[in-house]
Amino acid sequence: MIKPEILAPAGSPQALIAAVRSGADAVYLGIKNLNARRSAENFDDEQLREAVAYCHKHNVKVHLTLNTLVSDGELEKAQEAVQLACEAGVDAIIVQDIGIAELIHRTAPDMPLHASTQMSVQTAAGLKRLKRLGFTRAVLPRELSKEEIKKLCENSPVELECFVHGALCMCVSGQCLFSAVLGSRSGNRGACAQPCRLPFSVENGTGHDLSLKDLSLIDYISEMAEMGVCSFKIEGRMKRPEYVAAAVKACRNSVDGVTDNALRDDLRSVFSRSGFTDGYYRNKLGYDMFGIRRKDDVTAASGVLKKLEKLYEKEKADTVVDFAFTALKGEPMSLAARAGAKNVFIEGEVPQLAMNKATTAEAVHNQLSKVGGTRFLCGDIDIELDDGLFIPVSELNKLRREVIEKLDGNKAQSKSFTPEYIKIQPHTSGKKRLICRFADIDSIPENWDYIEQVIVPLGDEQKVKKSLRVSVEVPRGIFSNDEKILEKLKSANEYGITEAWAGTLDGIVLIQKAGLKPNAFIGSNVFNSLSVKSLEGMGINRILLSPEITLAQAQAIGGDAPRGVFAYGRLPLMLTRNCPQKNGKSCAECKRTGKLTDRRGIEFPIDCRSGCSEILNSVPVYMADRLSEIRNMDFMLLYFTNESKEKTSLVIQDYIKGSKKPHGEFTRGLLYRGVE
């Protein structure tokens, strides 16, 4: 059995120290942008270097999260972040954006790549494709059962990581547009506002029918390790250090076979939503998994914080370090340090002449004294500093860090990095065509003359006229149904279907296995030109761009593959495996449709199919009156969900002729306002 790795969240330097001192084997953290927890404190460049040095001194690995979607305008920032990670000695990078993954693989080939759970990979076929794309590890979805995890472990060519404690989203990770559409704060961009924790009710529901209890699989760690899971992840980069310490210690006890019921009670007290759930793992889905944070939960947390601080009390810093700093005009700066019998000396850059405010001795003292997180205590600091010099804080930090590394003998091992000029090849579109997706084939109109292609649910293609231009849609929630879906795709191929659409890597691979042309659909999260290029390299035929980008961003995305935008329909806000309607009635009572109602009375339709539920937006996107503003696109997607045949005919005519006025309530989606 592989030695289990306990992977702890570090949303701040304080949480990182708590994780290390409590027994974590690895931590994951983010820099100030481009990570899925932008509201956490996170780490600046210097803090990242110090965090890596501190962790490596304690034989703890550091995984950097770059697990968000990145726009074309942010690609240079992303490359700079990869360079920083290489220089700092980060042990792996966690990625969601397939274009960023390819960029890392080219510029930093020695950097291990971990596929974020935001990539929504659910099958062995998807894991094998990740291996081909250069990934060494995948973070599995939280929605998997024990049997599904076991099957993936038996067939995976990459390491597998599972969440074992922390917050549980209602939506499958990477498939949520809820926060983005309701408030322009994208969960795919690290800015989720958690609207699902607000009151949403199904018929006869609890009033909070999108809010799940926190996950806890700590009791199953040994069992999962025997199956082949190599890393056990704790969610919580926005949580307090006390929470991190308690969760790490509880996981460590589980690995070591230690029973500590009092610590478990404290862990529940420090943060829970009416307790914990293991429903997905045990394949016991239903109302027992739902919960909210009540007043009693908050009161319990305040009562255990002081107690939990003792889990990560400060290490004994038994060595005093004295510094001597010299900065003279025209000469390289120098820093000498003495700790016990050991002396070290290093030189830096020649200081600059100050253009405005000169660096003071006090400022130098403040930076050199920052030895927290090391085994040293700061002693005397002698400073010889000429007047009128400017010394960047980063240079002082670098000198201090290198001196401490020499004293400690734990210099981080950097990885090679070769910067790349990111050139975006402009796209030139052909004629803008209509592609129509129908959830119900009975709503397909009779007149197809102006429709490029009709998309129907996989399995319904043989109910549609064979002479028509038909393609099929693979469900986004595949999970353990991969073999059944592959057989259906093969049947579609035999029937004469040539193209299929998928919103996950799993679906794309299954489509290719069945001999069909794959198209990237909703859920593929195509946000930049590098992602387009990567998908083209995988053989993708057509690409639906992310509904979270603006028209201006979409028009600027490069590449050759035909691409389009979501131009009409109710955006699918959530893909859920635990149906919210189970809070109000059993599956036997359900007619595959329902609705959620928010606190203002706004209704969101629910569509249940293929073992999952989709929560749709309350109103459709409508752009037929602004067709001239949809430029440089090869197609427009009209996404029909619960419309009648009469309504679909009317909408299609609007987009053929160019309507001057929308029918009823509508939204422009995110095509103008975009997301954070």
Give residue spans per PLM region.
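Short glycine-enriched, charge-decorated loop/helix-capping segments at active-site entrances
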Residues: 36-42
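Glycine-rich, highly charged phosphate/nucleotide-binding loops
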Residues: 43-48
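Conserved phosphate-binding/catalytic loop of the ribokinase/pfkB sugar-kinase fold
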Residues: 119-123
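Surface-exposed amphipathic alpha-helical tracts and adjacent flexible/coil segments at the periphery
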Residues: 1-22, 26-36, 49-52, 58-86, ...
